[in-house]
Amino acid sequence: RKLEAGNCCKNCAAKLSPWFNDRRQSTVEEIKEQLAYREANKEKVAAFHITRTLGEDTKVLLDEDAGLFMVTASRNLADANPDVLAFSDVTGCKLDIDERKTEIEYRDAEGKRQSFTPCRYAYSYDFYIVINVNNPYFNEIRFQLNDSAVDNDAETLLDGPDAVRPMRGGTRPG
């Protein structure tokens, strides 16, 4: 794996924090420092006492007695070695929403795709939490909240310009 001035073997790259993304701009010495940090982190993981779990797939694990947390999707904490951080390392938190829109079209009498006027769209969303942290190797932890896109299940190709999309959840009161 390429570094700013040198290389990092595949085994060492796998030991780096999953939240670290500046490998190519790092020196060999900086990588060695992070590997030492990650090795010391194993002891923190072993001593971590989960008092609360937040989330389904990716989880925020809290050790409220020690004021620590970690974020991981792994069931085997010893193997995953998730970064153990202090509550005081958190500098901010936000919800990040990725929106995608797909144009809804219809087939005309000749079977060709046509756009509505004005254009109609189907939307889907993915929701992410971004936890900003004070850490020498990464400054944010970003993970997806939903396990599949949240959408309105709209058909994006209708049989004709007068075709009506079924509404989910019934109608809204007047």
Q: Model segments located where?
A:
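The −1 position to Zn-ligating cysteines in a subset of zinc-ribbon hairpins
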Residues: 8
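Acidic, Ser/Thr- and proline-rich intrinsically disordered linker/docking segments
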Residues: 91-174
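Anionic N-terminal interaction surfaces
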Residues: 3, 13-83
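Amphipathic alpha-helical segments
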Residues: 84-92
